[in-house]
């Protein structure tokens, strides 16, 4: 299991980093007391979670008397984000947020927070100065450090419209215009994973429609990757989610795997009715 502690100065990008880590599959928890980290990791392991992260900010340090002891015992990867004081000041002025230490003098609060977090900074495996970084630049820095340079993932999810489209879908492709194996008694019990079903679905007349779907999915995924996203979900739907959508999702995966890391999920392939 990978265990990561994300910390650093308020306004340096922890919210952006937290979201990106979640996109990479980390289960993230904010300001959990260190004495609860071992039970968290035990529960995560029992549930099959491979990546866990805890966000720590200066407000919580007063309640973290056992932090050093737990860090020494668990030895998590520590990522620390910082920025120059004038940059943090500008960011706070733009967002009109109140500093978490909230004493009323922003520059003094930034200095106090930096002193309070000095111990964690000294333990950091990665220190990122975000003063000149865009959100995308921060994500790229984290991806390089975590070995996720190829971290963009294209998810293809087949489904049946009768069961509703996946809520997480960024793009929905409708493959109901393609030939339907449901009406062939010999093919009806099979799924889109079957070669005979695939041949039926991808008849010569169906090829132009499929090529258009392939182009749309590829362009959408390229755009998402260019924006710095960690993953993009394309849902492929037919009526029941057993034949056409499965066949198309599989073929899309085959043809797009040379451009992206691809994951295929057949949500409704085992459903009847």
From Swiss-Prot:
Cite a single GO MF annotation: ATP binding
Q: Does the keyword GTP-binding apply?
A: yes
Coiled-coil annotation reads: none
Q: Which residues bind ATP?
A: 8-15
The UniProt keyword set, sorted, is:
ATP-binding, GTP-binding, Nucleotide-binding
Presence of keyword GTP-binding: yes
Reading the lineage from the top rank, the first entry is: Bacteria
Q: Which InterPro entries match?
A: P-loop_NTPase, RapZ-like, RapZ-like_N, RapZ_C
Binding locations of GTP: 57-60
- Which family does the UniProt entry place this protein in? Belongs to the RapZ-like family.
Record's function text? Displays ATPase and GTPase activities.
Q: HAMAP family attached here?
A: RapZ_like
This protein's name: Nucleotide-binding protein TT_C1664
Organism whose genome encodes this protein:
Thermus thermophilus (strain ATCC BAA-163 / DSM 7039 / HB27)
């Amino acid at each position: 299991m990978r265990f990561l502690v994300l910390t650093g100065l308020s306004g340096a990008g922890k919210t952006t980093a937290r979201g990106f880590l979640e996109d990479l599959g980390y289960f993230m928890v904010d300001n959990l007391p260190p004495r609860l980290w071992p039970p968290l990791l035990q529960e995560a392991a029992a549930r099959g979670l491979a990546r866990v992260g805890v966000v720590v900010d200066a407000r919580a340090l007063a309640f973290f008397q056992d932090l050093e002891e737990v860090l020494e015992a668990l030895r998590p990867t520590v990522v620390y984000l910082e920025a120059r004081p004038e940059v943090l000041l500008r960011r706070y002025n733009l967002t009109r947020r109140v500093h978490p230490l909230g004493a009323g003098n922003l520059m003094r609060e930034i200095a106090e927070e930096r002193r309070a977090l000095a111990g964690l900074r000294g333990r950091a495996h990665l220190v990122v100065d975000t003063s000149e970084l865009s959100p995308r630049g921060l994500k790229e820095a984290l991806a390089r450090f975590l070995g996720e340079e190829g971290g963009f993932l294209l998810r293809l999810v087949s489904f049946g419209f009768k069961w509703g489209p996946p809520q997480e879908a960024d793009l929905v492709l409708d493959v109901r215009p393609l030939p339907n194996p449901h009406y062939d008694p010999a093919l009806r019990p099979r799924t889109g994973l079957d070669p005979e079903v695939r041949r039926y679905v991808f008849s010569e007349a169906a090829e132009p429609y499929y090529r258009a779907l392939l182009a749309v999915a590829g362009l959408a995924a390229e755009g998402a990757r260019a924006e710095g996203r960690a993953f993009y979900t394309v849902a492929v739907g037919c009526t029941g989610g057993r034949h056409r959508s499965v066949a198309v999702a599989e073929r899309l995966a085959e043809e797009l795997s040379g451009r992206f890391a691809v994951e295929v999920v057949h949500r409704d392939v085992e459903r009847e009715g």
